[in-house]
């Protein structure tokens, strides 16, 4: 609610429609500067020639004299759970849960990723077995945000219209509440790690995806 992560990158539609040109120019001059930008070049190319082009086109841009202040807003501890119900016309029901998690650089982040893979894996994960195999849900997934500051782990369960969303939500919440009491086999953990390592290997074979991911981590 307080941290800027909760705000749209370029503002809401209403912001864009109402903002004045002088404010846009001021924002551009302050933030669109060499010390606040990253250039990623990916693919098969001549390194020396690429660097010469970078120097030619970006080198003349002067170093800014202003200094950017680091963000100081810290999301305060959450006082209890928050629930939001969104009603729309459609042919599927969704349950979404988010739990606070540490930032990407935290020592516990990798362990959290492995745990997430273990419990959401198709078809061996405990959530898959309890929700999809029992026909309460048609599918589910989970992921963690990879951020500089603390973020959240997200779970989504898809529930057919002829099934009870309340029952599926109860099973989901109950299972996640019991995760800290569960024990997992070495085989499950190894499989989870291998899946995560394979995703990194696949990423390294896709030039565009790798470049985009690098900018995400740098940012």
Which ranges hold each PLM region?
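M16 family metallopeptidases and their MPP-like homologs
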Residues: 1-14, 36-42, 93-103, 129-219
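Conserved, carboxylate-rich catalytic/transport cores that coordinate ions
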Residues: 28
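An aromatic/glycine/proline-enriched structural segment found at the starts
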Residues: 38-103, 203-204
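Short, conserved charged micro-motifs
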Residues: 47-51, 107, 163-167
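Short amphipathic alpha-helical signal-transduction/dimerization elements
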Residues: 58, 119-123, 173-181
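Active/ligand-binding-proximal structured segments within catalytic/core domains
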Residues: 97, 107-119, 126-129
């Amino acid at each position: 609610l307080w941290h800027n992560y909760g705000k749209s990158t370029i503002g809401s539609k209403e912001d864009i429609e109402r903002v004045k040109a002088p404010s846009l120019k001021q924002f551009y001059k302050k933030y669109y500067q060499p010390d606040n930008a990253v250039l990623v070049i990916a693919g098969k190319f001549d390194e020396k020639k690429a660097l010469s082009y970078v120097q030619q086109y970006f080198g003349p841009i002067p170093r800014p004299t202003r200094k950017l202040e680091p963000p100081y807003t810290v999301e305060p501890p959450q006082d209890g759970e928050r629930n939001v119900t969104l009603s729309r016309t459609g042919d599927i029901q969704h349950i979404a849960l988010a739990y606070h998690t540490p930032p990407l650089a935290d020592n516990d982040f990798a362990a959290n990723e492995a745990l997430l893979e273990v419990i959401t894996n198709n078809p061996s994960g405990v959530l898959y077995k309890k929700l999809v195999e029992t026909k309460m849900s048609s599918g589910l997934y989970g992921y963690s945000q990879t951020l500089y500051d603390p973020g959240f782990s997200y779970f989504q369960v898809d529930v057919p219209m002829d099934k009870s969303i309340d029952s599926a939500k109860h099973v989901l919440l109950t299972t996640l509440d019991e995760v800290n009491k569960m024990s997992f086999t070495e085989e499950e953990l190894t499989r989870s790690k291998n899946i995560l390592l394979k995703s990194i290997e696949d990423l390294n074979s896709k030039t565009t995806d790798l470049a985009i991911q690098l900018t995400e981590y740098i940012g």
